[in-house]
């Protein structure tokens, strides 16, 4: 077990010590009070930080560690009644266990709270409320399998403010202290003993109290006395010794000392510089085992050579470290390497020491790390490895490792990858006169191929086709005969490889016998039309012959024999009576028979088709449509009627009949929806024919829009309207205009023949008579519904708007009214009234003086403000509109006569 302590006492100053463990500070302060002839220690307070590490094992597994304080507890000074909180964060592997204790051995009081703050990841000791009994040094102990880390801090509980105030009060009320007598000591030695027990700041005061005036002499002797004591406190039993070691080793400087003060300051030094041990990343480590003190230097290199010293108090020991430099050499030989193509070749060599100028070469050319070459060095820098990836034949050659002036060489041999058949030739069985195909796939495309049959080399020609694309190879045998059966072999070779690789398969050629896959059917063809007989065999290589009525066809008038693979045809370009009969197709092992007959497909006379296409069949709503189409054809064709693409079926209003020479479709009680495209389709086994026509079911048009009156005189009225939105299936031929007197139910036609266009002038009217008008649209189906009647209108000449009012003047005035007068306009039609308007002097807005026009030629405007100036204007009005305004020349003030005041 190893125990490492670190403590430092600061009385007059604070110093820092760097070591491999931690930095620790302990501060002490003392106050003394002199009473009578004795020096009495009345009050003592201290701030303490102390760390110790107790290890259980010197060998700690990789990945494990001793406990370490990431955040250390801090000393606390607090008054009575307050609280004290100590916090610590610890790390280590295995995970440390945390406990808290008092250094005095007294148990921590029950009211204390010890817990783990999971948010801040802190271990906490909380004491509340504080009493003087809580003053002590508190230990935070972090323990795991490897060590105990103990951090000790102080808690100083001071007196509360109330007690201090009470003491001051008592001090003020106490009687005056008696005059102190001068203290006496026997000699200077006794005085030095007294001074050694008091703080330096009180030295002069104590000397005066004891009657010593040589203060500086006493202080010098006191320092010499302390130095002597300190020197005797360090006893070196074994000094540091010189060391000699090799590179990459670990060396230990050690000495044995007896220290009366275990807290004496120690510093390890290299040359003249102190070692910063905690920042050395494990390079330096300081250990203590009892009285033995050690400096451990790891991974020694040439730069570590030099003088190492240990300073303890005022003593210093030194020793020299000599690092031996070994000669560079290869630890072993490079061995030749043999690999197969695409494998990775590896060369490896180990040196006796690190060499920065190490290179790999291939055939004398230096290699650099890239996708082809992977160059690595071991962690200790001694083993060098070269990997040649995806080795090829071109990589064969001499590889060398050069370290300084040393060279090692070795040969790399790359063998070809043996050829393998990914898929071998497979036995093939084919029919006579067909194509046979042998194929295989190899692992490489860079090969030379030869084909053999029964051991004989085959040559490329019309019989044999030899193809080689990539890794696939095939042999094709065209028009295979029975003699082409046998054993076939493909032989593969590659450059640099004398081995022949081969694959073999058997080809079997079977005699070809045909069967009918699709036989002939009887043919019915119209005179002059083309026809054909067709047989499909199961084998396109088989030939055959045609027979008519049992005799082979040799002379072919009007016939053609065609073979398309397995399809055999006998074609008749133009059927005639001579072609009727029984036909047979005969092939090796099979035959097929069929008969040929003359037949006429249905036809419709072209003139009928033209007439149906040119003229639609028209029928009025509610009437019956009869659609009759003549045709010719045998046997009688199937008759199908279609309307707008949909097949027509018989129902209550629809019936269909088929005669020997005509087809009839009857639609009764027609409606507008029956209009559309009618298609007749005739079909029998020999052909088909179609006829297309249009059925138009008409109804009278819809009503036109309400007529609008556009011009009126005492003798005539002009009206306009819009065409109906529904024309009833036929264009509107014109319009009938009707009129009636207002209040009468009798409508009188204005025109005999339909009017073209949508405008009409109705004349012959009675002056001052009120009329209404309506319009009726007409098409092939007749007149439609009448429109909504127009607005009523009186037959008279139009009225003109009145002209300008004459002689507008003021006839009288008062404080609240102004009277005006005028004469009728000289131009335009007579007015039905007048609009008089006014505005005050301070506004530009005109306002009417009356809600309705004034009927006379004078008017008094009341409700005016006294002496306010007003402006007036007047306009004549009748049923034709409002005339232009006439304004009074000047403003008028609301005030009484004498005289009309105008300004």
UniProtKB/Swiss-Prot annotation:
Changing residue 7 to W: Found in a renal cell carcinoma sample; somatic mutation. PROSITE patterns: FN3, IG_LIKE. Residues 67-158, 232-322, 418-508, 606-696 form the Ig-like domain. This is Immunoglobulin superfamily member 22. Transmembrane segments: none annotated. It comes from Homo sapiens. CDD domains: FN3, Ig. Keywords: Immunoglobulin domain, Repeat. SMART domains: FN3, IG, IGc2. It comes from the Eukaryota. The gene is IGSF22. InterPro entries: FN3_dom (IPR003961), FN3_sf (IPR036116), Ig-like_dom (IPR007110), Ig-like_dom_sf (IPR036179), Ig-like_fold (IPR013783), Ig_I-set (IPR013098), Ig_sub (IPR003599), Ig_sub2 (IPR003598). Residues 703-798, 804-898 form the Fibronectin type-III domain.
């Amino acid at each position: 077990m190893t125990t490492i302590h670190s403590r430092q006492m600061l009385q007059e100053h604070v110093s820092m010590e760097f070591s491999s463990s931690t930095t620790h500070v302990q501060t002490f302060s003392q106050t003394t009070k002199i009473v009578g002839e004795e020096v009495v220690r009345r009050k003592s307070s201290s701030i303490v930080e102390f760390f110790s590490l107790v290890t259980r094992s010197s060998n700690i597994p990789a990945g494990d560690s001793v406990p370490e304080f990431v955040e250390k507890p801090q000393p606390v000074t607090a008054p009575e009644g307050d609280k004290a909180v100590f916090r610590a964060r610890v790390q280590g592997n295995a995970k440390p266990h945390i406990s808290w204790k008092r250094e005095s051995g007294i148990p921590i009081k029950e009211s204390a709270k010890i817990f783990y703050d999971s948010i801040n990841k802190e271990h906490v000791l909380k004491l509340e409320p504080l009493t003087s009994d809580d003053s002590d040094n508190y230990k935070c102990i972090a323990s795991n399998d490897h060590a105990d880390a103990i951090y000790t801090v102080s808690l100083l509980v001071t007196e509360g403010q109330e007690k201090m105030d009470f003491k001051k009060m008592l001090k003020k009320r106490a009687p005056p202290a008696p005059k102190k007598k001068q203290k006496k000591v026997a000699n200077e030695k006794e005085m030095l003993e007294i001074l050694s027990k008091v703080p330096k700041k009180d030295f002069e005061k104590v000397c005066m109290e004891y009657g010593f005036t040589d203060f500086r002499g006493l202080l010098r002797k006191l320092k010499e006395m302390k130095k002597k004591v300190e020197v005797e406190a360090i006893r070196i039993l074994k000094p540091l010794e010189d060391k000699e070691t090799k590179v990459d080793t670990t060396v230990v400087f050690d000495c044995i000392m007896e220290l009366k003060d275990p807290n004496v300051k120690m510093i390890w030094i290299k040359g003249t510089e102190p070692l910063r041990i905690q920042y050395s990343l494990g390079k330096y480590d300081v250990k203590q085992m009892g009285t033995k003190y050690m400096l451990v230097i790891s991974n020694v290199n040439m730069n570590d050579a030099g003088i190492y010293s240990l300073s303890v108090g005022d003593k210093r020991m030194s020793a020299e470290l000599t690092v031996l430099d070994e000669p560079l050499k290869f630890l072993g030989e490079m061995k030749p390497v043999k690999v197969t193509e695409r494998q990775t070749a590896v060369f490896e060599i180990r040196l006796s020491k690190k060499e920065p100028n190490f290179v790999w070469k291939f055939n004398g050319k230096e290699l650099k790390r890239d996708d082809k070459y992977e160059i690595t060095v071991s962690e200790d820098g001694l083993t060098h490895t070269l990997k040649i990836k995806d080795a090829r034949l071109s990589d064969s050659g001499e590889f060398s490792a050069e370290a300084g002036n040393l060279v090692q060489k070795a040969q790399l041999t790359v063998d070809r990858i043996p050829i393998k058949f990914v898929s071998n030739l497979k036995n093939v069985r084919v029919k006579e006169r067909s194509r046979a195909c042998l194929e295989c796939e190899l692992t490489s495309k860079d090969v030379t191929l030869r084909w053999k049959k029964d051991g004989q080399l085959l040559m490329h020609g019309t019989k044999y086709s030899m193809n080689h694309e990539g890794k696939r190879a095939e042999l094709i045998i065209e028009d295979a005969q029975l003699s082409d059966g046998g054993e076939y072999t493909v032989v593969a070779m590659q450059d640099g490889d004398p081995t022949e690789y081969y694959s073999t398969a058997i080809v079997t050629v079977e005699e070809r016998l045909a069967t009918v896959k699709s036989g002939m059917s009887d043919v019915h063809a119209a005179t002059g039309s083309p026809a054909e007989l067709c047989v499909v065999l199961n084998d396109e290589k088989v030939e055959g012959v045609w027979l008519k009525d049992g005799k082979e066809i040799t002379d072919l008038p009007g016939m053609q024999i065609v073979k398309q693979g397995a399809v055999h045809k006998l074609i008749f370009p133009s059927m005639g009576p001579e072609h009727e009969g029984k036909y047979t197709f005969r092939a090796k092992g099979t035959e097929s028979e069929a008969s040929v007959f003359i037949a006429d497909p249905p036809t419709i006379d072209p003139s009928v088709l033209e007439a149906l296409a040119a003229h639609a069949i028209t029928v009025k709503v509610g009437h019956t449509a009869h659609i009759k189409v003549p045709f010719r054809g045998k046997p009688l064709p199937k008759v199908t009627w279609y309307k707008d693409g949909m097949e027509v079926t018989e129902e209550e209003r629809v019936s269909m009949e088929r005669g020997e020479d005509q087809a009839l479709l009857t639609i009764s009680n027609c409606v507008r929806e029956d209009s559309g495209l009618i298609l007749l389709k005739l079909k029998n086994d020999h052909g088909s024919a179609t006829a297309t026509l249009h059925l138009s079911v008409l109804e009278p048009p819809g009503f036109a829009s309400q007529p609008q009156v556009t011009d009126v005189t005492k003798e005539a009225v002009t009206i306009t309207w819009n065409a109906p939105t529904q024309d009833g299936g036929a264009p509107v031929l014109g319009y009938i205009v009707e009129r009636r007197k207002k209040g009468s139910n009798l409508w009188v036609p204005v025109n005999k023949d339909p009017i073209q266009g949508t405008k009409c002038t109705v004349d012959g009217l009675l002056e001052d008579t009120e009329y209404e008008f309506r319009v009726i649209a007409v098409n092939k189906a007749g007149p439609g519904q009448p429109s909504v009647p127009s607005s009523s209108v009186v037959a008279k000449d139009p009225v003109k708007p009145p002209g300008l009012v004459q002689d507008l003047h003021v006839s009288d005035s008062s404080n609240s009214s102004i009277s005006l007068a005028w004469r009728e306009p000289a131009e335009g039609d007579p007015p039905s009234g007048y609009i008089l308007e006014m505005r005050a002097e301070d506004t530009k807005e005109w306002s009417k003086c009356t809600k309705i026009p004034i009927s006379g030629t004078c008017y008094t405007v009341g409700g005016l403000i006294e002496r306010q100036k007003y402006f007036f204007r007047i306009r004549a009005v009748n049923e034709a509109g409002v005339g232009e305004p006439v304004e009074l020349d000047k403003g008028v003030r609301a005030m009484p006569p004498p005289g009309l005041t105008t300004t």
